[in-house]
């Protein structure tokens, strides 16, 4: 992981609140000249990170990938959609140490020693085990496979590790999914396209909050995101204190067209958990746990208004970004604006 590379991963420090990163992934590299050699890392920018590993960029890379005879490297698998950088780093560390991580139960492990489990099947099997762990299984993580051979090995599933249907797996070419500047509209991932989609969602949400005056559809409590007095902060601690006082609670706005019903995120989350959202197929970890676990995070649920299913990972991601959007809008005056701009350069 290169601490200098990012899209927008430092937004947590900008406003003193958690915001889902635009993109963060854990990747698996394979050496082209030595295809039995692998490397595991994490990044918010896969295209640039791969170029660093291959020496195309002066800065970055890693000692192991610089060794003579191993370049070029190819990225063959990427797990992404993590809710934070820290969670991605936990996944990365667990994948690097599958023989001892707490995220894989001892009776389910397929790698038992530090220097074992170095085949492609072991790497993919451990990714499957982590995707099915009680910690990671409800985050809406997604998988990209960039090679037909890797896809074949994934489907063979040599160690018989189940993953749930809510884990989205896609097969594509790395060059088709990531463009050089990450803004190519024709590529699979386009930051500009993502930002435009968010802008449309934020603008429609602004109308709901400021003009429609909708209360929470569950508790019927009025939601007021407009401060009656001028707000000015001198530090991130002031922002944290402001939010802890109950200002600007996290909101959930149904993202289905022609609905846009408003909820407190906490109200909707509790409702989804009470209703239950059974997996269509359980992971091996969940089979072992049986009914002994009460999850704190739902997978999905139905909007009480339009009756369409809402993906919790997608909704919670937009909820953190929505609050950041309104907080910046609220603070975008005078000294407060300068505070945010200066903090962005930290």
Curated annotation (Swiss-Prot):
User: Which CDD domains does the entry mention?
Assistant: GIY-YIG_SLX1 (cd10455)
**Where would you find this protein in the cell?**
Nucleus
User: What PROSITE patterns does UniProt report for this protein, alphabetically?
Assistant: GIY_YIG
**CC per GO annotation:** Slx1-Slx4 complex
Q: Which top-level group of life is the source organism from?
A: Eukaryota
Name the cofactor(s) required for activity, per the record: a divalent metal cation
Keyword annotations for this protein? Answer: DNA damage, DNA recombination, DNA repair, Endonuclease, Hydrolase, Metal-binding, Nuclease, Nucleus, Zinc, Zinc-finger
The record's section on HAMAP family has: Endonuc_su_Slx1
Question: What does the subunit comment say?
Answer: Forms a heterodimer with SLX4.
Q: What is this protein called?
A: Structure-specific endonuclease subunit SLX1
Its lineage opens with: Eukaryota, Fungi, Dikarya, Ascomycota, Saccharomycotina
């Amino acid at each position: 992981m290169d601490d200098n590379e990012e899209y927008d991963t430092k937004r947590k420090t900008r406003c003193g609140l958690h915001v889902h990163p635009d993109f963060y992934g854990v990747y698996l590299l394979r050496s082209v000249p030595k295809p039995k050699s692998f490397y595991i890392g994490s990044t918010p920018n896969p295209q640039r990170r791969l170029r660093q590993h291959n020496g195309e960029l002066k800065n970055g890379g890693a000692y192991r990938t610089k060794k003579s005879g191993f370049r070029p490297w190819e990225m063959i698998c990427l797990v992404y959609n993590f809710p934070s950088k820290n969670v991605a780093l936990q996944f990365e560390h667990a994948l690097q140490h599958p023989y001892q991580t707490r995220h894989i139960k001892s009776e389910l492990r397929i790698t038992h020693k530090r220097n074992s489990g170095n085949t492609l099947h072991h790497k993919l099997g451990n990714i499957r085990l982590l995707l099915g762990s009680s910690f990671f299984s409800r985050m809406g993580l997604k998988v990209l496979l960039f090679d037909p051979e890797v896809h074949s090995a994934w489907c063979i599933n040599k160690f018989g590790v189940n993953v749930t249907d809510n884990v989205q797996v896609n097969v594509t070419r790395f060059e088709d999914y990531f463009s050089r500047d990450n803004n190519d509209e024709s590529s699979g991932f386009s930051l500009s396209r993502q930002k435009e989609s968010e802008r449309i969602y934020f603008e429609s949400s602004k109308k709901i909050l400021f003009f429609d005056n909708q209360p929470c559809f569950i508790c019927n409590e009025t939601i007021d995101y407009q401060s009656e007095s001028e707000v000015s902060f001198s530090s991130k601690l002031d922002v944290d204190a402001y939010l802890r006082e109950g200002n600007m609670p996290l909101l959930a706005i149904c993202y289905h067209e022609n609905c846009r019903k408003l909820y407190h995120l906490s109200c909707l989350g509790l409702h989804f958990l009470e209703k239950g959202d059974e997996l269509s197929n359980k992971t091996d970890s969940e089979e072992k746990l049986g009914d002994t676990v009460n999850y704190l995070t739902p997978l999905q649920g139905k909007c009480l208004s339009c009756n369409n299913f809402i993906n919790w990972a997608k909704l919670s991601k937009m909820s953190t970004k929505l609050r950041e959007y309104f907080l910046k809008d609220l603070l975008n005056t005078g000294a407060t604006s300068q505070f945010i701009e200066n903090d962005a350069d930290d």
